[in-house]
Amino acid sequence: MVNEKKMLPKRIILMRHGESAGNIDAGAYATTPDHKIPLTEEGRAQAREAGKKMRALISTQSGGACGENWRVYFYVSPYERTRTTLREVGKGFSRKRVIGVREECRIREQDFGNFQVEERMRVVKETRERFGRFFYRFPEGESAADVYDRVSSFLESMWRDVDMNRHQVDPSSELNLVIVSHGLTSRVFLTKWFKWTVAEFERLNNFGNCEFRVMELGASGEYTFAIHHSEEEMLDWGMSKDMIDDQKDRVDGCRVTTSNDSCSLHLNEYFDLLDVTDDEE
């Protein structure tokens, strides 16, 4: 049974880490473990600026009885570059606004296979493009499908936190959940959340460094990008017209279907040769 009194987050904000040493020199992965790759000074500056922008967005867009009492709860990947990103982002907020943070291993980067020799990784990534980005498993590492499984587990835990008010949110406050993670992990999160297909996942472009995307609770009771982001932005992310239309429909509850479980696009893809009615009808 759904808890009628549970405090749904007003926003769920997905953010990629700032510029890292690995982003400017792929050779760094050959000598430094992926989880220890640091931010550059530019990455730190990006994170500080993103924190200011995030606070401004939340504070100016919050409204209603709970608007002035908005609070933020952070989930962060345990990698050095995400942890440092959060420290810099946090400088944009006061302690009053931040009610908690949890280091969460399940939102870490895709495992590309221990130390990554640049020449070998170039060949491996070319193979991935031919095989398919979602199902290709890196030697000694993970596929995006593996990441999907652990992100699915994280989502279940996150919603249990919401159901049981483990964030300890005052009912008079507006809750914002911020997930500081990685590019592929964030795209996988969205694929799980919106029940996108593998083909739709493979359309998506990566987040920029310290880019954050805002899912806000619409009047329909569903989360959508269309409140904070334009159609042009979503096109730049690689979303199709159908995916964008779905986001728009989530704002006010005008959706004809609730997921790709019953979407006519996907029904036609699998069952286009079926008769419209039973013979005996």
UniProtKB/Swiss-Prot annotation:
Disulfide bonds: none annotated. GO terms for molecular function: catalytic activity. InterPro entries: His_Pase_superF_clade-1, His_PPase_superfam, PG/BPGM_mutase_AS, PGM-Related. The active site is at H17 (tele-phosphohistidine intermediate), E109 (proton donor/acceptor). It holds the Pfam family His_Phos_1. It comes from the Eukaryota. SMART domains: PGAM (SM00855). May play a role in carbohydrates metabolism. Belongs to the phosphoglycerate mutase family. PANTHER family: BROAD-RANGE ACID PHOSPHATASE DET1 (PTHR46192). This is Phosphoglycerate mutase-like protein AT74H.
